[in-house]
Amino acid sequence: MMDDKHVNNKKSILFVINTMGQAGAEKALLALMNMFDSSRYELYLYVLMAQGEMIHEVPTHVTVLNKRYCDISVLAKAGRSNMIKTVLGALLLRGGLFRDFGYIVSNAFAMIRDRRFQTDKLMWRVLADTADRFDKEFDLAVAYLEGGSTYYTADYVNAKHRAGFVHIDYTKSGYTRKLDGGCYAKLDRIFTVSDEVRENFLKVYPEYADKTRVFHNFLNIEDIKKRAGADGGFADNYDGVRILTVGRITYQKGYDIAVEAMKILKERGVKARWYVLGDGPLRDDISRQIQKSGLEKDFVLLGACDNPYPYYAQTDIYVHATRFEGKSIAIQEAQVLGCVIAASDCSGNREQIENGVDGILFEYTPGKIADAIQELTENPEKAERMALAASQKKINNIEDMEHIYELL
């Protein structure tokens, strides 16, 4: 049991997150925790699912509250198997099935009715209801992701103040008021990572406009630039145009459309190769699509990578062809490293890229994606000019920290 007295009168802050896998929100959380002066703030971290390889990058001044932890990637097959075991344990061994049976059934029927069944959205409530409890009262508890971490923070954390982050387009995410069960009413502040994310969140929860603030993602820019110069990156000696995408292989990220765009580029005679850094549940599906399209040498799935930054530094074009977005850490990383960027014209992306100035925004069709890439390959001076503008973008908004300090 933790001592309830704050060490040296430091303010205590608990961060709660769903997993610590290698994804954008987790990277932003690590950068945010590094913003706090350890002589004034006592930081804690609780990982709801207790899994993810980025746990090893948690700053040394942060106390991890999980008693047991699995550092296998949440995207690897072994990691996904462990996640299933965790969910089954919550359902069967910790009484989650009995406790949340009505919630599961009613929301499952709602999903079926809406033709959008998402098992993970159902299970976050079960994981929150069966997670560890702590006696300590924190000065501030912060749920850093939607779903489980927000449910847990709202219902089970003993804190003087509570806040939650929203990183996604809430109108397209699959979360609903019924799933959320009133969790946002229990938070003192709601932080969205962009203006557009705030706008879309308030379409679902208009009554929380007064307590919703924009709090931009933080990045460790010095670390990104340092790691970009390390050994690694492309190893195939390809002499054509390299295209890079970094992100989980999920429906949201749109790799199925990207493969179709690559097929069009090949048919047009554009000498290019598209690389993907990342893993995910749809990897086998995308692999089959690649083979069916005859693109085995043209669209390459490299898998997850501990250090993606040499790839950013070495690529010719960074493409972010997502169906929807909150605020993309991958785009920000590409901007830090001065990449030529092309992205889909969707929520999130259009707030990060000024079309024709520091990147290209394209309509979300295979043909338009191919057009944007071809335009950049045929106009190197324009591409270089946009890459320079991208590298000069302001990334970190230090003044946003005041939104947290005012709660302490």
Mark where each language-model region is.
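Conserved acidic donor-binding segment of nucleotide-sugar-dependent glycosyltransferases
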Residues: 355-356, 360-367, 375-380
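A conserved mid-protein helix/loop that constitutes part of the nucleotide-sugar donor-binding site
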Residues: 26-31, 241-264, 270, 281-287
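Donor nucleotide-sugar binding/catalytic pocket of nucleotide-sugar-dependent glycosyltransferases
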Residues: 161-167, 171, 185-227
